Swiss-Prot record:
Gene name as annotated: mscL
InterPro entries noted in UniProt: MS_channel (IPR001185), MSC/AndL (IPR037673), MscL_channel (IPR036019)
GO molecular function annotation: mechanosensitive monoatomic ion channel activity
Keywords annotated in UniProt: Cell inner membrane, Cell membrane, Ion channel, Ion transport, Membrane, Transmembrane, Transmembrane helix, Transport
Protein name, as recorded: Large-conductance mechanosensitive channel
Length: 141
């Protein structure tokens, strides 16, 4: 089997197509989660903490030249190495929200997939019933 035909067979399988669709939807969904965090959650968190913006949190690893504003963009522009942990906090919130949403979706799908409560066992075939009756009649003699 040639490489091209093996590749076609692989792509034609449902699993590969499902994976491709999942990746595309996941990429689009991550933008929705990023918007939820950036546009809805972080402003509320900022309001609770007095207008605090997590994306500008940083620790300067060198001395900041005098006259440079103490914002992340300005300190980076001045060439000072920084630990920008505020962006990490935002990305971490994105991840936690995405993980929670995926967990809820998978949980609901698993609930839908659960088998129905056990059905009553099927009645034994008529010949088995007759054989049991004969056996019981012979035991009584």
């Amino acid at each position: 089997m040639s490489f091209a035909s093996e590749f076609k067979q692989f792509i034609a399988k449902g699993n590969a197509m499902d994976l491709a669709v999942g990746v595309i939807i996941g990429a689009a969904f991550s933008k929705i989660v990023a918007s939820i965090v950036d546009d809805l959650i972080m402003p509320i968190v900022g309001a609770v903490f007095g207008g605090f913006d997590f994306s500008n949190l940083f620790i300067a690893l060198g001395s900041v030249p005098e006259g440079v504003a103490l914002t992340l963009a300005e300190v980076r522009k001045a060439g000072v190495p920084v630990l920008a942990y505020g962006n990490f906090v935002t990305v971490l919130l994105n991840f936690l929200i995405l993980a929670l949403i995926v967990f809820i979706i998978v949980r609901q799908i698993n609930r839908l997939k659960r088998p129905a409560p056990g059905a009553a066992p099927a009645a034994p075939p008529e010949d088995i019933v007759l054989l049991r009756e004969i056996r019981d009649a012979l035991r009584q003699k």
